[in-house]
């Protein structure tokens, strides 16, 4: 797809800003293609958020160029350009409170579109974050907030795709925290979690898409007893759920464990009080 190739171009060609915007506008098509009024409204809110983020990102690039004479992707010195770049990246990466486009737009997209968007949209932001803000304490703390916020709001949802969307915020929080910690194990754990999340979150969106397609229902309170009717979907959904839960033997256990270990070692002032209580 155009969106996926744009994400790849971010990584390999470094034409970052241009393809950053191409990805935002091509993702809009995945939302609007659903055709409903709700999808059109959600798509408009999505693109307004990303225009704001793209504007902040571009302004940060310009200020950084004026200060350094370079537009090479890499670590950024503190200043207004630093802040603007962080805001621009934060929109794509679903920083709190810049995250609201995500649970608003993903459930309104087409079933297949939501799968694609769950794979690349926030992950491109994580990649740029790793290139520019690795080791920033503010980023590490933001990751921790995202982990807690996302999972709490996911538990409050009835719509299955909205639940998964809020949980993306939580899972991206692990990636952001690992990058913010900045140690070898933290950054590698965060990047490993990117790839693991692509696998199990896409699988969960495909499973829920199959359920919605088969039953025509989105709400958990209206679903149940599907194991006999959809055994393959049930098995794959359980595999993805065990992975996202970090159960031993599944991929989520490895990458989450790396990030948690990095945090425990680097932020002892936060972990020591917990150890004393235990």
What residue ranges belong to the model's regions?
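Short, well-ordered junction/capping motifs at the entry into regular secondary structure
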Residues: 1-2
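Hydrophobic transmembrane alpha-helices and their helix-loop junctions in integral membrane proteins
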Residues: 6-16, 26-270, 276
């Amino acid at each position: 797809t155009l969106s996926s190739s744009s994400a790849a171009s971010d990584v390999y060609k470094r034409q970052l800003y241009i393809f950053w915007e191409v990805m935002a506008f091509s993702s809009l098509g995945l939302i609007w293609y659903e055709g409903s009024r709700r999808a059109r409204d959600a798509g408009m809110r999505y693109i307004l958020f990303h225009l704001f983020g793209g504007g902040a990102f571009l302004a940060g690039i310009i200020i950084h160029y004026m200060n350094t004479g370079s537009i090479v992707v890499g670590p950024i010195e503190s200043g207004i350009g630093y802040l603007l770049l962080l805001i621009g990246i934060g929109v794509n990466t679903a920083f709190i409170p810049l995250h609201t486009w995500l649970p608003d737009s993903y459930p309104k997209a087409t079933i297949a579109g939501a799968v694609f968007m769950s794979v690349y949209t926030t992950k491109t932001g994580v990649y740029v974050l790793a290139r520019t803000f690795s080791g920033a304490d503010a980023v590490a703390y933001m990751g921790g907030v995202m982990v807690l916020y996302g999972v709490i709001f996911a538990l409050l949802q009835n719509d299955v795709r909205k639940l998964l969307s809020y949980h993306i915020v939580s899972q991206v929080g692990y990636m952001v925290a690992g990058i913010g910690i900045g140690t070898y194990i933290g950054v590698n754990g965060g990047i490993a979690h990117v790839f693991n999340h692509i696998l199990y979150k896409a699988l969960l969106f495909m499973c829920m898409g199959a359920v919605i397609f088969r039953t025509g229902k989105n709400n958990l309170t209206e679903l149940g007893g599907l194991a006999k009717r959809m055994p393959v979907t049930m098995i794959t959904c359980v595999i993805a759920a065990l992975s996202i839960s970090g159960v031993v033997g599944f991929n989520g256990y490895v990458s989450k464990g790396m990030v948690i270990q990095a945090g425990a070692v680097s932020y002892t002032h936060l972990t020591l009080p917990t150890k004393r209580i235990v």
